UniProtKB/Swiss-Prot annotation:
Main subcellular location: secreted
Source organism of this protein record: Heterometrus spinifer
Protein name per Swiss-Prot or TrEMBL: Antimicrobial peptide HsAp2
Signal sequence bounds: 1-21
Subcellular location: Secreted; Target cell membrane
Gene Ontology biological process terms in this record: defense response to bacterium; defense response to fungus; killing of cells of another organism
Propeptide: 22-33, 69-74
Length: 74
C-alpha cells in the first residue's frame, strides 16, 4: 500500500510540475507578431490574395489537374 501511495504522490508531483512549466511559457500574441514583422498589413494582405489567385490563373491557362482541356473534350 505504501508503494502505491508513493507512486501516486510522485506522479501527481510530476503532473503539477509539468503544468506549472506550461503556464510559464511566454505566448506571442498576433499583435506582437505584427509589430515585430517589418511588412505592413496591406502587403501581407496582398501576398495572401496573390497566393489564392495564382493557382486559379494557372488553372485557367492550362487545364486543372484531373481535368482535360476543352479541345480534348470535343
Amino acid at each position: 500500500m505504501s508503494r502505491r501511495l508513493i507512486l501516486i504522490l510522485v506522479l501527481v508531483a510530476m503532473l503539477v510540475k509539468t503544468m506549472a512549466g506550461m503556464e510559464s511559457k511566454w505566448v506571442e500574441t498576433t499583435y506582437e507578431i505584427k509589430k515585430r514583422s517589418g511588412t505592413s498589413e496591406k502587403e501581407r494582405e496582398s501576398e495572401r490574395l496573390l497566393g489564392v489567385v495564382n493557382p486559379l490563373i494557372k488553372c485557367f491557362r492550362s487545364p486543372c489537374p484531373g481535368r482535360r482541356a476543352i479541345s480534348e473534350q470535343t
